[in-house]
UniProtKB/Swiss-Prot annotation:
GO terms for biological process: chemotaxis. The modification 4-aspartylphosphate is found at D49. Residues 1-115 form the Response regulatory domain. Contains a C-terminal catalytic domain, and an N-terminal region which modulates catalytic activity. Keywords: Chemotaxis, Cytoplasm, Hydrolase, Phosphoprotein. GO terms for cellular component: cytoplasm. Its main location: cytoplasm. This is Protein-glutamate methylesterase/protein-glutamine glutaminase 1. Residues 161-351 form the CheB-type methylesterase domain. Involved in chemotaxis. Part of a chemotaxis signal transduction system that modulates chemotaxis in response to various stimuli. Catalyzes the demethylation of specific methylglutamate residues introduced into the chemoreceptors (methyl-accepting chemotaxis proteins or MCP) by CheR. Also mediates the irreversible deamidation of specific glutamine residues to glutamic acid. The gene is cheB1. The active site is at S173, H199, D295. GO terms for molecular function: phosphorelay response regulator activity; protein-glutamate methylesterase activity; protein-glutamine glutaminase activity.
Amino acid sequence: MVDDSAVVRQVLVNVLNDAADIEVIATAADPLLAIEKMRKQWPDVIVLDVEMPRMDGITFLRKIMSERPTPVVICSTLTEKGARVTMDALAAGAVAVVTKPRLGLKQFLTESADELVATVRSAARANVKRLAARVTAVPLEAEVKHTADVILPAQSGRALAQTTERIVAIGTSTGGTQALEEVLTALPRVCPGIVIVQHMPEKFTAAFAARLNGLCQIAVKEAANNDRVMPGRALIAPGGKHLLLRRSGAQYFVEVLEGPPVNRHRPSVDVLFRSAARAAGSNALGIIMTGMGDDGAAGLLEMRQAGARTVAQDEQTSIVFGMPKEAIKRGGADRILPLGAMAREIVTQLQ
């Protein structure tokens, strides 16, 4: 646990040590002290602040990933600057991000403690060798588990193909920021409209979208209500809100809305995929990529049953082979592809 705030360290340590399967073996106020302690006992997961004295978290992260790749969870503040730095950390190899406790510690313990524990568990299962290789190649959840029914009730029958416009729906979680960067930067300007759910806290998705927009040939933005899904543009669900695909005549739009977490996530991949099955049917391509848990597995099956093409990322290239594995197990994927083949699969959706 590396954070320059003693209060934050204590809160996070207490939360993690309360979990039966997690033990915090050391804490440090800065990366240099952390390195000394880690040499005595190397951790399975590092929880890291990004703004600290003596050595910033990004420099420390790059050092770790180059010398001894280890899953790193970024603990960052909900500020614009914090979001930008967090995006740099994810690009440098961090597997996930959680929000730092604020003054309302009681609210944090109520709303975010379970998310912190689940994120650390997920990080411990991450394929760090794959993550470290990707970093080198690319320069610089709620107690009640709701289903998508609480946002969009299920319905029988296939969507009517009232348009020939193709769309792509992508869902991902742990390791997804790096995976999405690899896929989206490989796309040409001429490609189908894309809608994306990446599990990420609110206020971080805008910075993530802005970063990708600067790297990609296609346009990338955080989705706003009633944004049109257009060829050559990707819309990323805002953190803390669900994203649905809607059709009006021959055009597709997105709806951004509040609602309870689904599969302990908001945004939820299942919600997006169900809406894509209903609105686009056989005009859609559904892709589920790296991530822990089962969010998106049921929705991908619904997309396939509605006539869509569906793809799951393979185990070898996934940072965490959880969501794709569950989708494959349930019969939702008609193809299993490595990450490097996803961009080509998206382009063929135009044909």
